[in-house]
Regions:
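ABC ATPase nucleotide-binding domain signature region
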Residues: 30-37, 43-101, 199-203, 343-346, ...
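Catalytic Walker B motif of ABC-type/P-loop ATPase nucleotide-binding domains
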Residues: 150-154, 379
Length: 407
Protein backbone atom coordinates (compact mmCIF):
# COMPACT_ATOMS: atom_id res chain seq x y z
CA UNK A 1 0.00 0.00 0.00
CA UNK A 2 1.07 3.58 -0.66
CA UNK A 3 0.05 6.10 1.99
CA UNK A 4 0.18 9.90 1.65
CA UNK A 5 -0.33 12.11 4.68
CA UNK A 6 -0.95 15.89 4.70
CA UNK A 7 0.63 16.59 1.31
CA UNK A 8 0.60 20.30 0.49
CA UNK A 9 2.13 21.87 -2.63
CA UNK A 10 2.83 25.60 -2.83
CA UNK A 11 4.13 27.55 -5.82
CA UNK A 12 7.46 29.16 -4.99
CA UNK A 13 6.87 32.38 -6.92
CA UNK A 14 3.38 33.56 -5.96
CA UNK A 15 2.98 31.29 -2.89
CA UNK A 16 -0.32 29.98 -4.25
CA UNK A 17 -1.34 26.68 -2.68
CA UNK A 18 -1.81 24.29 -5.60
CA UNK A 19 -2.75 21.22 -3.55
CA UNK A 20 -3.98 21.74 0.02
CA UNK A 21 -3.52 19.09 2.72
CA UNK A 22 -4.05 15.90 0.71
CA UNK A 23 -4.13 12.49 2.40
CA UNK A 24 -5.00 9.19 0.70
CA UNK A 25 -4.14 5.50 0.38
CA UNK A 26 -3.45 3.56 -2.82
CA UNK A 27 -4.15 -0.17 -2.51
CA UNK A 28 -3.71 -3.18 -4.82
CA UNK A 29 -6.38 -3.14 -7.52
CA UNK A 30 -7.00 0.60 -7.21
CA UNK A 31 -7.14 2.46 -10.52
CA UNK A 32 -6.93 6.01 -9.23
CA UNK A 33 -7.31 8.73 -11.88
CA UNK A 34 -5.71 12.08 -11.14
CA UNK A 35 -7.66 14.75 -13.02
CA UNK A 36 -7.74 18.55 -13.21
CA UNK A 37 -6.81 21.52 -15.35
CA UNK A 38 -3.33 21.92 -16.83
CA UNK A 39 -0.92 23.45 -14.33
CA UNK A 40 -2.81 22.38 -11.21
CA UNK A 41 0.05 20.19 -9.95
CA UNK A 42 -0.85 16.69 -11.17
CA UNK A 43 2.51 15.80 -12.72
CA UNK A 44 4.40 17.35 -9.81
CA UNK A 45 2.40 15.20 -7.40
CA UNK A 46 3.15 12.09 -9.46
CA UNK A 47 6.86 12.95 -9.54
CA UNK A 48 6.87 13.45 -5.77
CA UNK A 49 5.23 10.06 -5.24
CA UNK A 50 7.99 8.53 -7.35
CA UNK A 51 10.80 10.24 -5.42
CA UNK A 52 9.48 11.86 -2.21
CA UNK A 53 12.99 12.81 -1.09
CA UNK A 54 13.84 14.74 -4.26
CA UNK A 55 13.06 18.49 -4.52
CA UNK A 56 10.63 19.57 -7.22
CA UNK A 57 11.21 22.59 -9.46
CA UNK A 58 9.07 25.69 -8.86
CA UNK A 59 7.14 24.27 -5.90
CA UNK A 60 7.57 23.63 -2.20
CA UNK A 61 6.03 20.49 -0.73
CA UNK A 62 5.29 19.25 2.75
CA UNK A 63 3.87 15.94 3.87
CA UNK A 64 4.91 12.31 3.99
CA UNK A 65 4.70 9.32 1.68
CA UNK A 66 5.21 5.70 2.71
CA UNK A 67 5.31 3.06 -0.02
CA UNK A 68 5.05 -0.60 0.96
CA UNK A 69 4.66 -1.87 -2.62
CA UNK A 70 7.43 -4.23 -3.69
CA UNK A 71 8.02 -2.64 -7.10
CA UNK A 72 6.76 0.76 -8.23
CA UNK A 73 7.41 1.90 -11.80
CA UNK A 74 6.76 5.21 -13.52
CA UNK A 75 6.15 6.34 -17.09
CA UNK A 76 6.32 10.08 -17.71
CA UNK A 77 4.73 12.27 -20.36
CA UNK A 78 7.87 12.30 -22.50
CA UNK A 79 10.27 9.52 -23.40
CA UNK A 80 13.48 9.77 -21.34
CA UNK A 81 16.03 11.90 -23.19
CA UNK A 82 18.89 9.64 -22.08
CA UNK A 83 17.29 6.70 -23.90
CA UNK A 84 16.81 8.49 -27.25
CA UNK A 85 20.32 7.52 -28.38
CA UNK A 86 19.94 3.82 -27.56
CA UNK A 87 19.25 1.25 -30.23
CA UNK A 88 15.99 -0.67 -30.01
CA UNK A 89 18.00 -3.75 -29.03
CA UNK A 90 19.92 -1.95 -26.28
CA UNK A 91 16.72 -0.44 -24.87
CA UNK A 92 14.74 -3.68 -24.86
CA UNK A 93 17.55 -5.88 -23.55
CA UNK A 94 19.06 -3.57 -20.97
CA UNK A 95 21.44 -5.77 -18.91
CA UNK A 96 20.47 -3.88 -15.75
CA UNK A 97 16.87 -5.11 -16.16
CA UNK A 98 17.62 -8.50 -17.74
CA UNK A 99 17.21 -10.48 -14.51
CA UNK A 100 14.01 -8.66 -13.60
CA UNK A 101 12.08 -8.92 -16.87
CA UNK A 102 10.05 -11.93 -17.93
CA UNK A 103 11.07 -11.90 -21.60
CA UNK A 104 8.45 -14.46 -22.60
CA UNK A 105 5.82 -12.08 -21.28
CA UNK A 106 7.69 -9.15 -22.86
CA UNK A 107 7.49 -10.69 -26.36
CA UNK A 108 3.81 -11.43 -25.78
CA UNK A 109 3.17 -7.80 -24.82
CA UNK A 110 5.13 -6.48 -27.80
CA UNK A 111 2.97 -8.56 -30.16
CA UNK A 112 -0.24 -7.47 -28.46
CA UNK A 113 0.85 -3.85 -28.78
CA UNK A 114 1.27 -4.23 -32.54
CA UNK A 115 5.05 -3.80 -32.61
CA UNK A 116 6.90 -6.24 -34.88
CA UNK A 117 8.94 -8.58 -32.59
CA UNK A 118 11.52 -8.99 -35.38
CA UNK A 119 12.48 -5.34 -34.86
CA UNK A 120 13.49 -5.87 -31.22
CA UNK A 121 17.08 -6.65 -32.24
CA UNK A 122 17.22 -3.70 -34.63
CA UNK A 123 20.04 -1.17 -34.47
CA UNK A 124 17.59 1.63 -35.25
CA UNK A 125 17.83 4.40 -32.66
CA UNK A 126 14.93 4.87 -30.26
CA UNK A 127 14.96 8.58 -31.05
CA UNK A 128 13.93 7.86 -34.65
CA UNK A 129 10.78 5.96 -33.67
CA UNK A 130 7.39 7.61 -33.61
CA UNK A 131 6.03 8.76 -30.26
CA UNK A 132 3.57 5.87 -30.25
CA UNK A 133 6.25 3.27 -31.02
CA UNK A 134 8.44 4.54 -28.18
CA UNK A 135 5.52 4.36 -25.78
CA UNK A 136 4.65 0.83 -26.91
CA UNK A 137 8.15 -0.43 -26.10
CA UNK A 138 8.15 1.54 -22.86
CA UNK A 139 4.82 -0.01 -21.85
CA UNK A 140 5.95 -3.53 -22.79
CA UNK A 141 9.19 -3.21 -20.83
CA UNK A 142 7.40 -1.70 -17.84
CA UNK A 143 4.58 -4.26 -17.70
CA UNK A 144 7.05 -7.14 -18.18
CA UNK A 145 8.62 -6.10 -14.87
CA UNK A 146 5.27 -7.12 -13.32
CA UNK A 147 5.13 -4.14 -10.95
CA UNK A 148 2.91 -3.89 -7.88
CA UNK A 149 2.27 -0.18 -8.49
CA UNK A 150 2.18 1.88 -11.69
CA UNK A 151 2.50 5.68 -11.84
CA UNK A 152 1.51 6.86 -15.32
CA UNK A 153 1.52 10.44 -16.61
CA UNK A 154 -0.97 10.66 -19.50
CA UNK A 155 -0.31 7.14 -20.83
CA UNK A 156 -2.95 7.44 -23.55
CA UNK A 157 -1.01 10.15 -25.41
CA UNK A 158 0.52 9.21 -28.77
CA UNK A 159 -1.20 5.81 -29.01
CA UNK A 160 -3.28 4.67 -31.97
CA UNK A 161 -6.89 3.70 -31.32
CA UNK A 162 -6.34 -0.06 -31.28
CA UNK A 163 -3.48 0.21 -28.79
CA UNK A 164 -5.42 2.66 -26.67
CA UNK A 165 -8.27 0.16 -26.42
CA UNK A 166 -5.78 -2.59 -25.49
CA UNK A 167 -4.16 -0.42 -22.82
CA UNK A 168 -7.54 0.49 -21.32
CA UNK A 169 -8.52 -3.17 -20.94
CA UNK A 170 -5.07 -4.21 -19.70
CA UNK A 171 -4.84 -1.56 -16.99
CA UNK A 172 -8.42 -2.12 -15.86
CA UNK A 173 -7.72 -5.84 -15.34
CA UNK A 174 -4.29 -5.53 -13.71
CA UNK A 175 -4.10 -6.71 -10.09
CA UNK A 176 -1.55 -3.95 -9.49
CA UNK A 177 -2.38 -0.50 -8.17
CA UNK A 178 -2.41 2.19 -10.86
CA UNK A 179 -2.32 5.94 -10.31
CA UNK A 180 -2.58 7.76 -13.62
CA UNK A 181 -3.11 11.22 -15.08
CA UNK A 182 -5.41 11.61 -18.06
CA UNK A 183 -7.60 14.13 -19.88
CA UNK A 184 -9.10 11.43 -22.13
CA UNK A 185 -12.67 10.91 -20.93
CA UNK A 186 -13.13 7.60 -22.77
CA UNK A 187 -9.90 6.27 -21.26
CA UNK A 188 -10.91 7.51 -17.80
CA UNK A 189 -14.30 5.84 -18.12
CA UNK A 190 -12.79 2.48 -19.05
CA UNK A 191 -9.99 2.36 -16.45
CA UNK A 192 -10.65 4.42 -13.31
CA UNK A 193 -12.44 3.07 -10.25
CA UNK A 194 -11.43 6.03 -8.05
CA UNK A 195 -11.07 9.74 -8.83
CA UNK A 196 -8.72 12.33 -7.31
CA UNK A 197 -9.81 15.72 -8.65
CA UNK A 198 -7.64 18.81 -8.17
CA UNK A 199 -9.70 21.86 -9.05
CA UNK A 200 -9.37 25.61 -8.80
CA UNK A 201 -12.13 27.64 -7.14
CA UNK A 202 -12.93 31.29 -6.44
CA UNK A 203 -11.87 32.31 -9.97
CA UNK A 204 -8.56 30.41 -9.77
CA UNK A 205 -7.57 32.06 -6.48
CA UNK A 206 -7.70 28.84 -4.44
CA UNK A 207 -7.64 25.07 -4.89
CA UNK A 208 -9.43 22.11 -3.43
CA UNK A 209 -9.12 18.36 -3.76
CA UNK A 210 -11.91 15.80 -4.01
CA UNK A 211 -11.24 12.08 -3.57
CA UNK A 212 -14.13 9.75 -4.41
CA UNK A 213 -14.43 5.98 -4.73
CA UNK A 214 -16.41 6.15 -7.96
CA UNK A 215 -15.85 5.40 -11.61
CA UNK A 216 -15.43 8.43 -13.85
CA UNK A 217 -18.89 8.37 -15.48
CA UNK A 218 -20.64 8.18 -12.10
CA UNK A 219 -18.45 10.93 -10.68
CA UNK A 220 -19.07 13.19 -13.66
CA UNK A 221 -22.86 12.73 -13.58
CA UNK A 222 -23.05 13.21 -9.79
CA UNK A 223 -20.82 16.27 -10.03
CA UNK A 224 -23.01 17.79 -12.75
CA UNK A 225 -26.14 17.17 -10.68
CA UNK A 226 -24.44 18.73 -7.66
CA UNK A 227 -23.48 21.76 -9.76
CA UNK A 228 -27.10 22.22 -10.79
CA UNK A 229 -28.44 21.84 -7.24
CA UNK A 230 -25.86 24.20 -5.79
CA UNK A 231 -26.50 26.71 -8.57
CA UNK A 232 -30.25 26.68 -7.95
CA UNK A 233 -29.80 27.03 -4.18
CA UNK A 234 -27.19 29.77 -4.56
CA UNK A 235 -29.42 31.78 -6.91
CA UNK A 236 -32.36 31.37 -4.50
CA UNK A 237 -30.17 32.58 -1.61
CA UNK A 238 -29.02 35.56 -3.67
CA UNK A 239 -32.60 36.50 -4.54
CA UNK A 240 -33.67 36.32 -0.88
CA UNK A 241 -30.58 38.26 0.19
CA UNK A 242 -31.35 40.98 -2.35
CA UNK A 243 -34.93 41.28 -1.03
CA UNK A 244 -33.72 41.53 2.58
CA UNK A 245 -31.10 44.12 1.67
CA UNK A 246 -33.71 46.17 -0.23
CA UNK A 247 -36.05 46.14 2.79
CA UNK A 248 -33.12 47.08 5.01
CA UNK A 249 -32.18 50.04 2.80
CA UNK A 250 -35.77 51.26 2.84
CA UNK A 251 -35.91 51.02 6.64
CA UNK A 252 -32.50 52.73 6.98
CA UNK A 253 -33.50 55.60 4.70
CA UNK A 254 -36.86 56.00 6.49
CA UNK A 255 -35.33 56.15 9.99
CA UNK A 256 -32.55 58.45 8.79
CA UNK A 257 -35.13 60.82 7.29
CA UNK A 258 -37.15 60.76 10.53
CA UNK A 259 -34.02 61.55 12.54
CA UNK A 260 -33.29 64.59 10.40
CA UNK A 261 -36.87 65.84 10.84
CA UNK A 262 -37.12 65.14 14.58
CA UNK A 263 -37.17 68.23 16.85
CA UNK A 264 -38.36 66.54 20.03
CA UNK A 265 -35.46 65.13 22.13
CA UNK A 266 -37.47 62.12 23.35
CA UNK A 267 -38.43 61.20 19.80
CA UNK A 268 -34.82 61.69 18.74
CA UNK A 269 -33.60 59.23 21.36
CA UNK A 270 -36.15 56.64 20.25
CA UNK A 271 -35.18 57.06 16.61
CA UNK A 272 -31.46 56.84 17.46
CA UNK A 273 -32.09 53.53 19.23
CA UNK A 274 -34.08 52.36 16.23
CA UNK A 275 -31.19 53.33 13.92
CA UNK A 276 -28.78 51.24 16.03
CA UNK A 277 -31.09 48.26 15.55
CA UNK A 278 -31.24 48.94 11.80
CA UNK A 279 -27.42 49.04 11.61
CA UNK A 280 -27.24 45.80 13.59
CA UNK A 281 -29.50 44.18 10.99
CA UNK A 282 -27.18 45.54 8.28
CA UNK A 283 -24.14 43.93 9.90
CA UNK A 284 -26.03 40.65 10.18
CA UNK A 285 -26.89 40.78 6.48
CA UNK A 286 -23.22 41.38 5.64
CA UNK A 287 -22.19 38.30 7.63
CA UNK A 288 -24.99 36.34 6.00
CA UNK A 289 -23.75 37.34 2.54
CA UNK A 290 -20.27 36.03 3.38
CA UNK A 291 -21.69 32.61 4.28
CA UNK A 292 -23.88 32.26 1.20
CA UNK A 293 -23.26 29.52 -1.32
CA UNK A 294 -21.37 30.56 -4.44
CA UNK A 295 -22.83 29.90 -7.85
CA UNK A 296 -20.44 27.15 -9.02
CA UNK A 297 -18.21 27.98 -11.96
CA UNK A 298 -17.42 25.14 -14.32
CA UNK A 299 -13.88 24.82 -15.65
CA UNK A 300 -13.69 26.82 -18.86
CA UNK A 301 -13.45 24.91 -22.10
CA UNK A 302 -10.55 25.94 -24.29
CA UNK A 303 -11.72 28.05 -27.21
CA UNK A 304 -9.16 28.57 -29.93
CA UNK A 305 -9.92 31.03 -32.72
CA UNK A 306 -7.55 31.15 -35.65
CA UNK A 307 -7.87 34.52 -37.38
CA UNK A 308 -7.54 34.31 -41.12
CA UNK A 309 -8.07 37.74 -42.70
CA UNK A 310 -7.14 36.45 -46.16
CA UNK A 311 -8.37 32.85 -46.60
CA UNK A 312 -6.61 30.76 -49.18
CA UNK A 313 -8.56 30.24 -52.39
CA UNK A 314 -10.34 26.91 -52.25
CA UNK A 315 -8.85 25.94 -55.60
CA UNK A 316 -5.23 26.77 -54.66
CA UNK A 317 -2.93 23.73 -54.65
CA UNK A 318 -0.93 23.33 -51.46
CA UNK A 319 0.34 19.82 -52.12
CA UNK A 320 0.15 17.86 -55.35
CA UNK A 321 2.50 14.88 -55.19
CA UNK A 322 1.68 11.77 -57.24
CA UNK A 323 3.39 8.48 -56.34
CA UNK A 324 4.97 9.78 -53.14
CA UNK A 325 6.50 7.20 -50.76
CA UNK A 326 6.98 8.09 -47.09
CA UNK A 327 10.51 7.06 -46.08
CA UNK A 328 12.48 7.13 -42.85
CA UNK A 329 16.22 6.50 -42.83
CA UNK A 330 16.02 4.77 -46.20
CA UNK A 331 13.14 2.51 -45.14
CA UNK A 332 9.86 2.78 -47.07
CA UNK A 333 6.95 3.23 -44.69
CA UNK A 334 4.17 3.35 -47.30
CA UNK A 335 3.23 2.25 -50.76
CA UNK A 336 3.21 5.03 -53.39
CA UNK A 337 0.61 7.62 -52.41
CA UNK A 338 -1.15 10.36 -54.31
CA UNK A 339 -1.11 13.41 -52.06
CA UNK A 340 -3.48 16.25 -52.95
CA UNK A 341 -4.30 19.19 -50.71
CA UNK A 342 -6.07 22.39 -51.69
CA UNK A 343 -6.70 25.59 -49.78
CA UNK A 344 -9.36 25.50 -47.00
CA UNK A 345 -9.37 21.68 -46.84
CA UNK A 346 -9.02 20.14 -43.37
CA UNK A 347 -7.26 16.79 -43.57
CA UNK A 348 -6.74 14.31 -40.73
CA UNK A 349 -3.87 11.81 -40.83
CA UNK A 350 -4.94 8.58 -39.14
CA UNK A 351 -3.43 5.14 -38.84
CA UNK A 352 -1.45 2.83 -36.55
CA UNK A 353 1.68 4.01 -34.75
CA UNK A 354 4.78 3.89 -36.91
CA UNK A 355 3.15 4.02 -40.35
CA UNK A 356 4.68 7.43 -41.09
CA UNK A 357 2.07 10.04 -40.09
CA UNK A 358 4.49 12.35 -38.26
CA UNK A 359 7.15 11.81 -40.92
CA UNK A 360 4.68 12.79 -43.62
CA UNK A 361 3.57 15.84 -41.65
CA UNK A 362 7.19 16.99 -41.38
CA UNK A 363 7.59 16.52 -45.12
CA UNK A 364 4.50 18.64 -45.80
CA UNK A 365 5.94 21.29 -43.48
CA UNK A 366 9.18 21.28 -45.47
CA UNK A 367 7.27 21.61 -48.76
CA UNK A 368 5.29 24.59 -47.49
CA UNK A 369 8.02 26.39 -45.55
CA UNK A 370 8.86 29.73 -47.19
CA UNK A 371 6.10 29.27 -49.77
CA UNK A 372 5.26 32.80 -51.06
CA UNK A 373 1.90 34.11 -49.86
CA UNK A 374 1.56 31.45 -47.16
CA UNK A 375 1.86 31.79 -43.38
CA UNK A 376 2.66 28.35 -41.99
CA UNK A 377 2.09 27.12 -38.45
CA UNK A 378 3.55 23.83 -37.25
CA UNK A 379 2.90 21.97 -33.98
CA UNK A 380 5.00 18.82 -33.55
CA UNK A 381 4.28 15.92 -31.24
CA UNK A 382 7.14 16.97 -28.97
CA UNK A 383 6.92 20.72 -28.35
CA UNK A 384 10.54 20.78 -27.20
CA UNK A 385 11.43 20.74 -30.89
CA UNK A 386 10.03 24.24 -31.41
CA UNK A 387 9.78 25.87 -27.97
CA UNK A 388 12.85 27.64 -26.52
CA UNK A 389 13.73 25.85 -23.30
CA UNK A 390 15.59 28.87 -21.86
CA UNK A 391 12.60 31.27 -21.94
CA UNK A 392 9.70 31.77 -19.57
CA UNK A 393 6.18 31.59 -21.05
CA UNK A 394 5.93 35.39 -20.73
CA UNK A 395 9.21 35.91 -22.61
CA UNK A 396 8.09 33.53 -25.35
CA UNK A 397 4.73 35.25 -25.88
CA UNK A 398 6.17 38.76 -26.07
CA UNK A 399 6.79 40.32 -29.45
CA UNK A 400 9.01 43.27 -28.52
CA UNK A 401 10.23 42.39 -25.03
CA UNK A 402 9.54 45.92 -23.79
CA UNK A 403 8.50 46.67 -20.22
CA UNK A 404 5.32 48.28 -21.53
CA UNK A 405 4.34 45.03 -23.25
CA UNK A 406 5.04 43.03 -20.07
CA UNK A 407 2.70 45.20 -18.02
Amino acid sequence: MLHVENFTMTHQQDLKVLIPSLSFDLKPGDKLALIGEEGCGKSSLLNWLRQPDQPLPYVEVTGTCSNAFGRTVWIGQTFPAQDEGLTIEAYCFDPVLAEQIDYGYFYQLVSQLGFDPDRLTSQQLMGTLSGGEKLKLQLARTLALEPDCLLLDEPSNDLDLATLDWLSRTLANLPAAVLFISHDEAFLSQVANRILHIETIHNHKASRVQLVNLDYETYRSQRQAQFQRQGQLARKQQEEQAKQEARHRQMHDKVQHQLRQAHDSSLGRLLAKKMRNVKSVGRRLERQAEDMLEIPIQEDAILVKLPCPHPLPASKWLVNEPDYVVRLEGRSLTQPLTLEWRGQEKIGLVGPNGVGKSTLLKQVRDWLTDRPGLRLGYMPQDYRQVLPQDQTPLDFLQESGSQEEKT
